[in-house]
Structure formats: structure tokens, C-alpha cells
Design a protein with these regions (language model features):
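Active-site signature of cysteine proteases
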Residues: 36-203
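Papain-like cysteine protease catalytic cores
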Residues: 1-56
Length: 203
């Protein structure tokens, strides 16, 4: 990628591609969270049906069902662009929208009961997992360093809108591991959103 060393990390589309190629299994397929010393299962059983890991992945998540959205003011809006982040070494394309549209897209998806995968910057003074809040920040261009799932909305006592985010760092904060992100933070610290095409269209 332009002479730069390829990173070992990826973005949301990297997970979709891995799931399509390698498959996934339900959480309870493994008796323990660390299981790479024993043979991997050839079959997955769910709701009385038998699947290979690839078949199971395709039954719950088809990569073609998803789209990626970003906001880059240096590129034309309403067009598919290659997001210029080191983690996008696969050179995937994203629909480029204005920052205000990011909020509108999330609100529309949540209104129709769809979660949204949020990818963005948390290495700044506005993010605190300990307090469960992501708010005011002065980040100029976000770095790609974390993913969370947007699952709901909340109102601050001052009337401001916050997004309820499901995080993966355990439950040790005042909100049982959830993080409440202000729409101001979402505007300035979002690298990408991943959601189904149905969610994007508000179906």
C-alpha cells in the first residue's frame, strides 16, 4: 500500500471476509474461551440443523448484505471512496457522506431496530471506559483503533443525545460495560459505520 508496511490489523470488512471464507460457530460450541489446542469442530448444530462453520456463517451474515460508510471532507460526498487508513490495507471502498449524515444514518437504523457497527477513535481525552462516557474531544482526524456496536439511544439531563454502545471490555463500569457516546463525539471520531443495506435504507 503505497510503500507502507502492511498492518496486521484490519477493519470491519476484514471480519466479514474472514467469516465468509473461514466460517463462524455459535458461542456455546466451545466449552472454554481458549480452545486452539483441541481439534476444531467440523459441524455446528443450531436449532436442530447441522452446518459447517462456513454454512453457519452464511446463514446468519452474508457479506453482500452489508455496506460501509465513512466521512472524508477531502473526497467527494455521495461517492464510493477508498478510505485512507493504514488498517484499510485491503483497499475496501466506503460510501462517503457528510458528518451530519453519519448521525442521521445511525438514527434511521436504530429507529428500524437495526444495530450499527461503529469503528473509530477512542485514544483521546473524551473517551473513558471507566466512566462509561465518550463525550467532548478535540480530535482533528480520527484514528482507527476500536469497534463497538451501537444498540440504542439515551438523553442526557441537559437534553443532548447519546448513543448506547455495546463494548467488549467486560462489565466493570457504571453501565455494566456499556459506553454512552455523544452525537458530537460520533461526528468527530467516527472512522466508519458498517450496517446492513436494509438498515441504511430504513427498512
Amino acid at each position: 500500500m503505497d510503500g507502507r508496511k502492511q498492518r496486521q490489523r484490519g477493519m470491519g470488512h476484514s471480519l466479514l471476509r474472514l467469516m465468509a471464507n473461514k466460517g463462524i460457530v455459535p458461542f456455546d460450541t466451545y466449552p472454554d474461551s481458549t480452545h486452539d489446542q483441541l481439534p476444531l469442530p467440523q459441524w455446528v448444530f443450531m436449532l436442530g440443523a447441522r452446518y459447517t462453520p462456513q454454512e453457519f456463517a452464511h446463514s446468519v451474515c452474508g457479506p453482500e448484505e452489508y455496506m460501509a460508510v465513512t466521512s472524508d471532507p477531502t473526497q467527494p460526498y455521495g461517492k464510493m471512496i477508498v478510505a485512507d487508513y493504514p488498517d484499510n490495507w485491503e483497499r475496501e471502498t466506503f460510501l462517503n457522506v457528510p458528518q451530519d449524515s453519519l448521525v442521521a444514518i445511525v438514527l434511521r437504523a436504530l429507529h428500524h431496530r437495526h444495530p450499527v457497527c461503529w469503528e473509530g477513535d477512542i485514544n483521546n481525552s473524551g473517551f473513558s471506559f471507566r466512566s462509561g462516557i465518550a463525550d467532548h474531544t478535540t480530535s482533528s482526524r480520527p484514528d482507527d483503533d476500536h469497534c463497538m456496536t451501537i444498540i440504542g439511544l439515551a438523553r442526557h439531563p441537559d437534553g443532548r443525545l447519546f448513543f448506547k454502545m455495546k463494548n467488549s471490555w467486560g462489565t466493570d463500569n457504571p453501565y455494566g460495560g456499556m459506553v454512552y457516546m455523544s452525537q458530537e463525539y460520533l461526528r468527530c471520531c467516527t472512522v466508519a459505520l458498517y450496517l446492513t443495506r436494509e438498515a441504511y435504507l430504513g427498512k
